[in-house]
Amino acid sequence: MERIKNNIFFNLSNTMLKIIGLVCMTIDHLYLYVFANTTVNVSIFRIVGRIAAPLFLFAVIQAMRYSSDKKSYIFRLYKYHICICILEIVLSYLLHSEISFNVIPEWLFTAIYIYLIDMIIKKEHIIRHIVLMLIPILVGIGSLIIGTSGSVINVFLPNIFTIQYSPFFLILGIGWYYMKKKKNQIVALIFF
């Protein structure tokens, strides 16, 4: 397993970070779906689960940093988003309740904005990339005005303003990407 260069997490591989995130997320969901309606108070499960999101975000940032084909990676994230949205729709229909567990838009938007900012920094088609940065914001505003939140439209055009962890999570990811030093990444994690 190849170690990620300059990793702030004790020189763990990206795969190990994902496995740790998966275990933490599973513990969180175990509480959410098994113990939530009982008198058992094991909120430590929820606390452990909060570790997963920053770990997955860090894995996405590392993928964007070291990927040879960033567009392909972004497109894969988009395909995963669509698949999970379809699964949500099917489960909501079968269980007769609204189910929402798709956190991939946070990572998708983070990857998109990292790519666009990189293109602007490289001075490649600056105006085009600035316009492309505005499109998710304008689509999100339009979606909020029209009231399409939770509709099939969001399967193909996720709303940047209704992502589960808020746009600040996206800003944290972009900040992490451009902060090369370990100390700066840790400070950003603490304050966001």
Residue ranges and their predicted role:
Residues 1-192:
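Alpha-helical transmembrane segments and their immediate juxtamembrane cytosolic regions
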